[in-house]
Each structure stands twice: as structure tokens, then as C-alpha cells.
């Protein structure tokens, strides 16, 4: 089965600093190499996301440069796109989607699924595709760092026809592709929309840490998936994914007795961190709780079709 092509511009993870450029020029002069080394880099909000430069007038691209060489720069200087958070955030103060003037023919209602590696994001996406595909016109985009593993899993398990599942290889920090530079994911979603005129779109991020969360420009509804295998302390650790996602899912609850995790503790801590934010406890592999997730998504989708500012 043919694997669909993906957008060719993955998001950047780093920018060169002036200090690095100076060091490179000095090294070139010392070794007598050609001093022409014209760099062209972009900020996360830039129109282009490839890191490129030329040697001897021969252009080439560096997909993801993330080499913090010793002595070249400090974390404050190197132009990294990571956000520094003052606090975990509050559910009631999260960014809300604004549908005013939204053209749904360009991109349908988009559900973003995030969470740490191995929490069950892809299994959830598979279950949602199976549950929605007969009633709704849907498509999906997956994100991996260097592979198409999740796309291939979904195709192999016949979640949707292969042409409705696109893959992004981020080449670096997964959160950059869903927040700092969303161009690759946005492009894939818009192409799916143009081809299939979908009613709902799904995008799954690569596995990341608790600080990762979606940009509202990309995801109309944000689901964050954690699981019990990391211990019952995870909800109280906070982070935007836990505190500010529209829906928090605690997955693999069937494993709780085997890993010594207390669901009561996780339920208590999730409520303390999220306030009125909904939390569902699931065992996606056993199809436990999936219907409740689907019901919440459908309610959010229906509410969005009235346009205007979404309610917290």
C-alpha cells in the first residue's frame, strides 16, 4: 500500500546565534577555507521552516539542527524555541478557539491529541477513527520524529483508507510542530480538507513532556493523554497539557493494580489541577471509556458550528 507523501518543511528546533556565526567565520579564516557561508534561518513564526545555507554557491537544507556545541552559546543566547513557563496554567484561563469568520471549507474542526510517549495516543486515535468513520467524514495526521511509525500502525490496522492518513516527520522536538511552528501540520490538514471535504480532522503529536500543548491556531479541541504506568503522581506534576487541555484522559487504568497506582489519588489530583476541566479514565485497548471520549468530541464539534468565541 502506497504511503502518502508528507509536507516537505518540518519545523525548526534551533537557530544559529551571532556568536556561532562569528566562531564559524573565525574557524574558516584560520583554516583558509572559503569564507562564504551565508546562513538563512527563520524564527518559529517565519514563513519558511527549513534551515539552509550555501557552500560554494551550492544550496542545501539542514532538516533539524540541534547540536548545542560546548562553549559556543548559552541556553539564553542560542535562540531556542522552547517556552519558559512561570506556572502550569489554569483550565479556566486557557486559550479558547475563536470561530468568528472561520472558513470550515479550508480546514474542518480539528482535534489535537497529545501526551507522553507510550500513553496510548495512537491507540486512542485508532479507536476514534473506528468509532467515527461510518458516521462522519474524517481524516488524520500523525507526527513522529524520524519515522512514520504511527501512520503505518493506523494503516496496518485499517483505521481509515491509507490516503486519509498523513505523516509528519518532525525531525526534532515534537512540541515545536504543534505549537511554535505549526506550518507542516497545518499544510497536511488543509490538503486533506481540500481532497476529502472532511467534517472532522485529527492530529496526533509525537510523544513529549508535560509542558507540551497545542496552539489554538492548530487544534480546536485539545485532548491530553497520560497513563497509570508513570505512577499516580503524574496529574499533580501539572504542566499545560494536564491543566489546560480541553479533556484530560488517564489511560490504561486496567494496569493500575499492577504498577501500584491509585486511581483515587489520580482522580483527586486531576480535579485539584484542572478545576472544572473534564477528566476521563479509560482503558482504550479494552474499549473502556472510548464512547465517552467520542461523546465529548461530538458535543464540542456541534458547538463549534455556531461560530463565535467558544465558551470555557
Swiss-Prot record:
The lineage of its organism: Eukaryota, Fungi, Dikarya, Basidiomycota, Agaricomycotina. URE4, URE6 and URE7 may form a complex that acts as a GTP-hydrolysis-dependent molecular chaperone, activating the urease apoprotein URE1. HAMAP family: UreG. PANTHER family: UREASE ACCESSORY PROTEIN G. Residues 53-86 have a biased composition (Basic and acidic residues). Urease accessory protein that binds 2 nickel atoms likely via its conserved histidine-rich domain and supplies nickel for the functional urease URE1. Has probably a dual function as a nickel chaperone and GTPase. Plays a role in host brain invasion. A motif (Switch domain 1) lies at residues 147-154. Keywords: Chaperone, GTP-binding, Nickel insertion, Nucleotide-binding, Virulence. Pfam families: cobW. A motif (GTP binding P-loop) lies at residues 115-122. The gene is URE7. InterPro entries: CobW/HypB/UreG_nucleotide-bd (IPR003495), P-loop_NTPase (IPR027417), UreG (IPR004400). Residues 28-86 are annotated as: Disordered. Residues 36-87 are annotated as: Histine rich nickel-binding domain. GO terms for molecular function: GTP binding; GTPase activity; nickel cation binding. It comes from Cryptococcus neoformans var. grubii serotype A (strain H99 / ATCC 208821 / CBS 10515 / FGSC 9487) (Filobasidiella neoformans var. grubii). Disruption phenotype: Fails to grow on agar media with urea as the sole nitrogen source. Leads to the inactivation of the URE1 urease and reduces the efficacy of brain invasion in mice. One of its GO terms (biological process) is urea catabolic process. A motif (switch domain 2) lies at residues 171-172. CDD domains: UreG. This is Urease accessory protein 7. Belongs to the SIMIBI class G3E GTPase family. UreG subfamily. NCBIfam families: ureG. The histidine-rich N-terminal domain is involved in nickel-binding. The GTP binding P-loop probably binds GTP and the switch domains undergo a conformational change upon GTP-binding.
